[in-house]
């Protein structure tokens, strides 16, 4: 597996390990682009905490910040990093399937 895929997948998994960030991503997925204030209205989290998490999600590439009206920044989901993480997991699954198939052959099943 190319090292860049592993590095991107690692960053995505680190970001997804936090339940607050998963909630933010779920809110963006269901409600579309939103500001930190919009997300604070929907989630039981302060706007400041949401802004901190959005900054990390943007660094990883899971969200993108778009300038909006009156200097308000709207955040939108990006699927590319998730697709890389899915590729990483699919490669692991293929490796395990190959090993399990070999074990079944070895055991005579």
What are these regions (language model features)?
Residues 54-55:
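Short, hydrophobic-biased segments on the C-terminal half of alpha helices
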Residues 58-69, 76:
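Beta-hairpin "wing" of winged helix-turn-helix
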Residues 20, 32, 58-61, 107:
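Short amphipathic alpha-helical segments enriched in hydrophobics
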Residues 2, 7-46, 69-83:
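N-terminal helix-turn-helix DNA-binding core of bacterial DNA-binding proteins
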Residues 14, 26, 58, 64, ...:
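A cross-family signal for key residues in well-ordered alpha-helices
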Residues 1-8, 30, 83-109:
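Amphipathic alpha-helical dimerization/coiled-coil segments
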